[in-house]
Curated annotation (Swiss-Prot):
The gene is rpl40e. One of its GO terms (biological process) is translation. It holds the Pfam family Ribosomal_L40e. Keywords: Ribonucleoprotein, Ribosomal protein. GO terms for molecular function: structural constituent of ribosome. This is Large ribosomal subunit protein eL40. The lineage of its organism: Archaea, Methanobacteriati, Methanobacteriota, Methanomada group, Methanococci. Belongs to the eukaryotic ribosomal protein eL40 family.
Length: 47
């Protein structure tokens, strides 16, 4: 149970496409720059 909880805390975020800031999952705009285009944080590496 603790592992799933930790994974959710790490990966259940949204990333701003303009400034790459981490935002809460329920965010509709970036907390730093106000940009509205957010993507979910990648769960797998891109390598």
């Amino acid at each position: 149970m603790a592992f799933e909880e930790a994974m959710n805390r790490v990966f259940h975020k949204k990333i701003c496409l303009r400034c790459t800031a981490r935002n809460p999952w329920k965010a509709t705009k970036c907390r730093k720059c106000g940009y509205t285009k957010l993507r979910p944080k990648a769960k797998e590496s891109r390598g």
